[in-house]
From Swiss-Prot:
This protein's record includes keyword Transmembrane: no
InterPro entries on file: Ribosomal_bS6, Ribosomal_bS6_sf, Ribosomal_S6_plastid/chlpt, Transl_elong_EF1B/ribsomal_bS6
Family under the similarity heading: Belongs to the bacterial ribosomal protein bS6 family.
Species this protein is from: Trichodesmium erythraeum (strain IMS101)
MF (Gene Ontology): small ribosomal subunit rRNA binding; structural constituent of ribosome
Protein name: Small ribosomal subunit protein bS6
Protein role: Binds together with bS18 to 16S ribosomal RNA.
Amino acid sequence: MNKFIYETMYILRPDMTEEKVEQAITKYKSMLEEQGAYDIKIQHRGKLRLAYEINNQREGIYIQMNYQGPPTQIAILERAMRLSEEVIRYLTVKQELPKTPETDTQKNLEPAVALAE
């Protein structure tokens, strides 16, 4: 099974207090941990101006999470964000882990051994 690196960027309402923002970050981080995610890195980007108005908001609090884990965790996380009134936008992208040079070298050697026989 391939392992993937995921990045989820979500935008919280700008009128949330710092305490509520921290609660939201903790909630989504613990949700990922419960689903088997690991190597979770969170970056609090702060309050930034939106490119366009979303739900009558011109600013938002940007949070970025980078993590690894099973693909099933994404649907659960995004469903929770979709139902939450504190999240105004979210996006998750995935990237396949790069293959180690060791495995590429082994693949190249196998056909040569087969041809030599």
